[in-house]
């Protein structure tokens, strides 16, 4: 006789493997796609795969937020920005200041490495143990606006910078 527990675990492992495979496939397609619109659509499909993985890992709130925020807002924003720009793919060469770009990149890596190794990574014990518990949303909200207020504010600055960049790109060459 087949044990239902083993069948459920095997099915869960198979679904996880399928979602991981689909997510990695679309992530690779984002990088290698020649058409920017297809790359944007592949990015949205990759985000759907990540949302499925969140739901499979019993973090339904994060899965729904992934769909609403990243797919519904960011993904569509990226597609609109790509479709509204009138630049041709593979156009003329872009003037790049390579030494300055290398210096900025090196500075960014130094900040990330310093932050990663210089932080004492304590586990947060304030979250409930059951992630499917509805009170988890309240715990996440409290943590965002208490312990993680600085990353939350940095995220708002990054979104503002991307909005300014999108407006700059959508203006067109003649209006700058």
Swiss-Prot record:
The chain crosses the membrane at residues 13-33, 39-59, 64-84, 99-119, 140-160. One of its GO terms (molecular function) is NADH dehydrogenase (ubiquinone) activity. The keyword Glycoprotein does not apply. Pfam families: Oxidored_q3. It is an enzyme of class 1 (oxidoreductase). Optimum temperature is 39 degrees Celsius. Disulfide bonds: none annotated. This is F(420)H(2) dehydrogenase subunit J.
């Amino acid at each position: 006789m087949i044990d239902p527990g083993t069948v459920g675990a095997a099915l869960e492992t198979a679904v996880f493997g399928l979602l991981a495979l689909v997510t990695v496939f679309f992530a690779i397609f984002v990088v290698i796609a020649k058409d920017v619109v297809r790359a944007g659509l592949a990015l949205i499909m990759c985000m759907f795969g990540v949302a499925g993985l969140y739901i499979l890992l019993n973090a339904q709130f994060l899965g729904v937020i992934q769909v609403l925020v990243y797919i519904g807002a960011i993904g569509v924003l990226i597609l609109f920005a790509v479709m509204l720009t009138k630049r041709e793919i593979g156009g003329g060469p872009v003037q790049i200041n390579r030494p300055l770009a290398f210096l900025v990149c090196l500075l960014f890596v130094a900040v990330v490495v310093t932050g990663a190794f210089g932080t004492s990574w304590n586990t947060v014990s304030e979250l409930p143990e059951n992630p499917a518990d509805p009170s988890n949303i309240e715990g996440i909200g409290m943590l965002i606006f208490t312990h993680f207020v600085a990353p939350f504010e940095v995220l708002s600055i990054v979104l503002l910078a991307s909005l300014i960049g999108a407006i700059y790109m959508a203006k067109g060459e003649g209006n700058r």
